Amino acid sequence: MGDSVTFSGGGDLDNGMTVNVSYELDGGNYDDYSMKLGLGDGNGTVTFSGNSVNAGGVDAVKDIIPTAYTAVYENTNAVDNGLATTSGRNTTSMWGYANSFGSLDVSLGYNAKNSTASTDDGAESSIGLTWNDALMDGLTLVAGRFDDSNIAENNTYGLKYTAGGLTAGYQLTDVDYETSSSNDQEAVHMGVSFAVNENLSVSAGRQSVEITTTATDEVNTGMSASYTMGSITVGAAMNEVDAVGGVEGVKAEVTSLNLAFAF
């Protein structure tokens, strides 16, 4: 069970720019923080963030699969395989930039230290591209790349289509480590969500991850739902993983329940 308190605020500057600050207090060793500067006049937003809060880049597109509450790989084990950030990223003292050009959203991320927190190993950089209403109404296409210096290259591509209350998504991700002995990964992630009404949403999904050094694919499946009543939101999920890390016979199941209040 986790608990936290978040303080946030912001305002407009006389020159047309905007400032927003968020700070979360919790039981972690470091508190999450985010500072955003809106440049005004369509010039985008610069973000500086830390701990588990990312400033931008591939995180904007690493998982576009629709879900009512949480992703199918959440809470079942310590490592989220098959994502474009699986090789590890450093979100402490991270910079980001985001802007929109017509129907194209661009998100950039940069950190002078990679996930080993060593400048000697080089910097991290990433990009996330989102094309809204691509080719037809309701269709979204995404592409992203995360370069973890000399650790790995992560690439992802996906599409999402919405028609009425129904949304479906499909995404491919490739994690290519620099060392030949590491566990390169290829993942296929798909899911569908449905808004039953303005208060209730349900979803189901599946993710399979092929790991080069193992004979069995890791498979994550799950169902979730969320219900909103006034200022109260209830979320629930049942997730299951088979062959954790590609190890046959290693399984885990988890049931999650979340209650949130908006003041």
Residue ranges and their predicted role:
Residues 1-263:
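Outer-membrane beta-barrel proteins
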